[in-house]
């Protein structure tokens, strides 16, 4: 070996690049790369000690039976402590007794046998069905304590680490976790899922004794459509199905989302706006300035939308309908929210700060409204110039 062969960069590869994910079905195999690998291989997302490293992590598209294989042309001849044992590292995050390593034939035989005896979800667990591009899809809601779901979730949960930033595994023994599963109706291929948790909702001291049954806050935790199915509307269908299911559940008083990223915020905003538009909400806004807090509170509870989200939606609707109340409503909220930071500033500086925040927010609201279908409808709300 030459001196160059001992340079660290010769033996280092991006773990995002090395890890190849595959969904295998009878007619094809779709390969794609993870977005994140730092939960498994560290913050640098690099693996040292192997040349031409390829990590194959494949799943049957129906059962999601996992298969793992690690290939490389040579291994660094140094201390074993310096090297990551890739097989052992990945098996920490996979169902160890359920994952087939290297023996591809055994893996294929295993998932084919499992497909023959696979047990369908119960009819009462089916909460929705929809069609995209002439293909039918179905959504099921299943408690994580269901043995079939618990085994399936152990197989798919690694995708939360690989595609959801800052995700971690949930406590599978907590009976309050529920899983919303999307799959193709014909051949039962897995499309995506969301984990959800019902938190007890404290109604306040005045109402606590009068409540006849427990009420809950429904929380969407992890939400993922697998990459091969992204960009086709599955996320909106899944989100709307969860919301519809919870709005029809009298025990759920409010719907919240745990640490949403920007793309999920957009999906949520657009679908909440579309839902409110279809319900005729845009024509029901009071004309008072400011809009009464009592009306805001009673209306958001009717739709089971959390306070911050409802405020955003209300402001976007005011902008969309050209209401002169838009600027007043937004600036009043910003003034209250930033009261401590604005204290002691000159009046002119406060106005400048509010105007800057207002314009930035309006620009973002315009961006979101532009994604809504009603913005392009001939009889949809027409945006007018807001007087400033």
Curated annotation (Swiss-Prot):
It comes from Candida glabrata (strain ATCC 2001 / BCRC 20586 / JCM 3761 / NBRC 0622 / NRRL Y-65 / CBS 138) (Yeast). The record marks 177 as: Interaction with histone H4 N-terminus. The keyword DNA damage applies. Residues 197-199 are annotated as: Interaction with histone H4 N-terminus. Residues 142-306 form the N-acetyltransferase domain. This is Histone acetyltransferase type B catalytic subunit. Its EC number is 2.3.1.48. It catalyses: L-lysyl-[protein] + acetyl-CoA = N(6)-acetyl-L-lysyl-[protein] + CoA + H(+). Belongs to the HAT1 family. InterPro entries: Acyl_CoA_acyltransferase (IPR016181), GNAT_dom (IPR000182), Hat1_N (IPR019467), Hat1_N_sf (IPR037113), Hist_AcTrfase_B-typ_cat-su (IPR017380), Hist_AcTrfase_HAT1_C (IPR013523). Catalytic component of the histone acetylase B (HAT-B) complex. Acetylates 'Lys-12' of histone H4 which is required for telomeric silencing. Has intrinsic substrate specificity that modifies lysine in recognition sequence GXGKXG. Involved in DNA double-strand break repair. Component of the HAT-B complex composed of at least HAT1 and HAT2. The HAT-B complex binds to histone H4 tail. The keyword Phosphoprotein does not apply.
